[in-house]
Curated annotation (Swiss-Prot):
The encoding gene: LOC1
PANTHER family for the chain: 60S RIBOSOMAL SUBUNIT ASSEMBLY/EXPORT PROTEIN LOC1, 60S RIBOSOMAL SUBUNIT ASSEMBLY_EXPORT PROTEIN LOC1
Family: Belongs to the LOC1 family.
Biased composition (Basic residues): 187-196
Function: Required for efficient assembly and nuclear export of the 60S ribosomal subunit.
Protein name as catalogued: 60S ribosomal subunit assembly/export protein LOC1
Disulfide bonds: none
Main location: nucleus
DNA repair keyword on record: no
InterPro entries: Loc1 (IPR037650)
Region entry Disordered, spans: 1-65, 140-196
Coiled-coil residue windows: 121-167
Organism: Yarrowia lipolytica (strain CLIB 122 / E 150) (Yeast)
Length: 196
């Protein structure tokens, strides 16, 4: 977008300036004081320079020596995976964990530690008990599955036996019937009946 041109407000109007600021003679007349006025003894005010003065308190400036980095000096990098013996820092504990050497404080700390240890121990015991219960449930489930499988196998065998048994029974019954018929034919004598 094209920026809008801002119109100067009252472009044709003139600014009103006092002669004191514009005319040197008028300024000098103001600076002149007469003995008849109250401010005759006062010295004319001096204008303050608004330029900031350096805060060196009159001391000469000393240039700081430039500190060069290792890259600029071309120093090879140390192997940071292995700390040199002299450069190891002393191990520090956590901040704010230093207690006063008082018997009461030590006693309190020991009591609190015992409570925490007992809580942790009870948690461990609970975890062990839960493990035992889980194992027992697992064993029960495995037993049930084994029993179900055994029942299924028995039923399969029974079904096979019955299907085989039915056909064998039928054959045996037929054989028995045939034998009976044959025996019946051989043993039976024709009886003759005579009428008188």
């Amino acid at each position: 977008m094209v920026p809008k041109r801002f119109r100067k407000e009252n472009a044709g109007a003139r600014e009103v300036k006092s002669e004191v600021f514009g005319d040197k003679k008028a300024r000098n007349q103001l600076a002149h004081t007469s003995k008849n006025y109250d401010n005759a003894n006062e010295q004319p005010r001096k204008f303050k320079n608004r330029v900031a003065k350096p805060k060196d308190n009159g001391k000469p400036k000393v240039k700081k020596a430039r500190v060069y980095t290792e890259k600029e000096l071309g120093i090879p990098k140390l192997n940071t995976a292995i700390d040199p013996e002299g450069a190891k820092k002393a191990l520090r504990g956590k901040k704010g964990k230093k207690f006063v050497d008082n018997d009461q404080m030590n006693l309190l700390v020991s009591i609190v530690n015992e409570k925490i240890d007992s809580r942790n121990a009870s948690k461990l015991e609970k975890a062990r008990q839960l493990e035992m219960i889980r194992e027992q449930k697992r064993k029960e489930i495995e037993k049930r599955e084994a029993e179900k499988e055994a029942e299924i196998e028995q039923k399969k065998k029974e079904i096979k036996k019955t299907s085989r048994g039915k056909s064998a029974d039928k054959v045996q019954k037929k054989m028995e019937e045939l034998k009976k018929k044959e025996e019946g034919k051989g043993n039976s004598k024709k009886k003759s009946v005579s009428f008188a």
